[in-house]
């Protein structure tokens, strides 16, 4: 279990009060220094945390009981979590193991006391905590959690109260990425010592190599590394190593911040000679449309990441999709983007895989479907899924027939089914075509779950026979619909009576469980408790 996590505060330490179990006059007559083994345990009376000043510190601050993130004063610090195992050693005897619990250290099941073995003065007492739970810590792969080594050292006379001051034995490296496509970076690595081992009371780093960093947040990566090493190179997205303009020398218990600029290749759409601009699998590109309407199409292959920057595409003259996603891909919105659909083609279609759309409220994507019987607007083909994390997105499928604003659309064969639709944020306005849902399935189409966890969503069912605002089209089906988030606002409407606002369209065959969680606002009603059931 990862026990130590980080918070932003000031550099500090952890103090543990240690007390002998027996008074000195109970032990010997004063002439014998060595004590019987395993007779006189060291006990922990209490734990406190004190602070000390330092430049760019990394420490702890009261009254935290866990290593958690905090933004206080823009500084980093750490604190214990219940269950942390702390080793304590007196001299060279076998270390004891204690468990942190509610601001104190206890000897839990499976633990062992540290024992006094001598009545000597100035005995060395060491204590340490590692994220691995043993005396060898692997620093090479921190993608699933940060590595920690926290140590304390002092001297004390037998049977005296002892205060242990803990500090980080490792250095923290924090990489902050900048640039238009910095959010496309999935992984960052640096070079350093890949292991840290306790030997004869000293922690040593060894085995120089790659250290994979932990993604703390979008565009932010961290790793805790052995000090005394100069970081000279970094790489992103498993690419080649890039040299830093200035090497970073690592010091223990310090935060070392590195700003890394990320650039990508830009394609100016007007310079492309062909009708189709293809983004190959695995590529990261910026497609700059310059704000001018162009007679172009875009094909994006599997695992590609593309920024759409002021792209405006006219409706193709043939029955094709204007933007086509052929596998799992990411779209990052920038500026104003307007995509028009062909007579029998969608403005944007996901053929297979999962499309993820990111953007801010200032980044707009407008998709307009044309008068079509075999297309939708933001279309999802058989098994394809969609995740929207942000952006201002308009999916106007009101001119189409048999296609939803966002979701499945009729393709000329029975029951095409999308995989799932997830909306985590953004401003979304989706209008379904004839017989189709605003968000969900088109006419005679099916699909999986619809999950909304955030954002401001407006969904309008289509006309003719009618579709739900969110849910199914006529003779269609969908999975469960779950809407949550205290700041989530949903407006779901229909143009045909008899259709659910959230649930079934005209003669809808099946809709899974509709759940509106407490805190969500739907059609101007803020739910104070969970609601289960379709919204008519």
Describe these PLM feature segments.
Residues 7-15:
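Sec-dependent N-terminal signal peptides
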Residues 2-4, 8, 22-266, 275-276, ...:
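Sec-type signal peptide cleavage vicinity
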Residues 81-82, 120-124, 190-192, 224-227, ...:
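A composition-driven surface/loop motif
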Residues 14-15, 67, 231-232, 246, ...:
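Exposed boundary/loop context
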């Amino acid at each position: 279990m990862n026990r130590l996590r980080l918070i932003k505060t000031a550099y500090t330490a952890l103090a543990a009060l240690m007390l002998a179990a027996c008074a000195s006059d109970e032990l010997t007559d004063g002439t014998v220094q060595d004590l019987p083994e395993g007779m006189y345990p060291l006990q922990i009376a209490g734990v406190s945390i004190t602070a000390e000043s330092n430049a760019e510190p990394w420490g702890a601050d009261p009254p935290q009981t866990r290593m958690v993130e905090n933004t206080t004063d823009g500084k980093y610090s750490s604190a214990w979590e219940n269950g942390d195992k702390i080793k304590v050693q007196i001299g060279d005897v076998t270390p004891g193991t204690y468990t942190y619990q509610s601001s104190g250290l206890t000897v839990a099941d499976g633990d062992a006391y540290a024992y006094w073995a001598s009545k000597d003065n100035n005995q060395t007492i060491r204590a340490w905590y590692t994220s691995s739970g043993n005396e060898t810590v692997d620093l090479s792969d921190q993608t699933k959690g940060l590595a920690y080594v926290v140590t304390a050292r002092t001297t004390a006379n037998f049977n005296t109260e002892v205060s242990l001051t803990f500090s980080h034995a490792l250095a923290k490296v924090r990489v902050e990425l900048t640039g238009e496509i910095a959010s496309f970076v999935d992984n960052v690595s640096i070079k350093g010592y890949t292991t840290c081992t306790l030997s004869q009371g000293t922690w040593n780093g060894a085995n120089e190599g790659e250290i994979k960093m932990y993604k703390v947040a979008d565009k932010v990566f961290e790793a805790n590394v052995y000090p005394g090493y100069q970081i000279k190179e970094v790489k992103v997205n498993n690419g080649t190593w890039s040299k830093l303009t200035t090497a970073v020398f690592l010091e223990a218990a310090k935060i070392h911040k590195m700003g890394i600029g990320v650039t990508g290749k830009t394609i100016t759409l007007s310079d492309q000679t062909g009708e189709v601009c293809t983004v190959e699998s695995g590529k990261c590109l910026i497609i700059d449309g310059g704000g001018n309407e162009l007679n172009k199409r875009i094909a994006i292959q599997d695992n590609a990441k593309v920024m759409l920057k002021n792209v405006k595409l006219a409706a193709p003259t043939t029955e094709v999709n204007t933007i086509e996603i052929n596998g799992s891909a990411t779209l990052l919105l920038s500026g104003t983007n307007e995509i028009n659909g062909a007579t029998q083609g969608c403005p944007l279609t996901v053929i297979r895989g999962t499309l993820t759309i990111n953007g801010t409220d200032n980044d707009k994507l407008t998709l307009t479907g044309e008068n079509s019987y075999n297309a939708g607007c933001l279309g999802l083909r058989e098994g394809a899924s969609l995740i929207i994390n942000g952006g201002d997105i308009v999916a106007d499928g009101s001119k189409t027939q048999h296609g939803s604003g966002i979701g499945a659309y009729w393709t000329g064969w029975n029951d095409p089914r999308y995989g799932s639709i997830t909306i985590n944020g953004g401003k979304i306005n989706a209008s379904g075509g004839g017989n189709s849902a605003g968000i969900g399935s088109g006419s005679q189409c099916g699909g999986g779950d619809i999950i909304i966890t955030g954002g401001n969503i407006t969904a309008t069912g289509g006309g003719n026979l009618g579709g739900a605002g969110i849910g199914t089209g006529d003779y269609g089906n969908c999975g469960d619909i779950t809407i949550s988030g205290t700041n989530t606002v949903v407006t779901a409407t229909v143009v045909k009576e008899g259709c659910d606002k959230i649930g079934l369209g005209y003669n809808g065959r099946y809709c899974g469980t509709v759940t509106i969680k407490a805190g969500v606002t739907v059609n101007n009603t803020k739910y104070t408790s969970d609601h289960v059931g379709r919204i008519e």
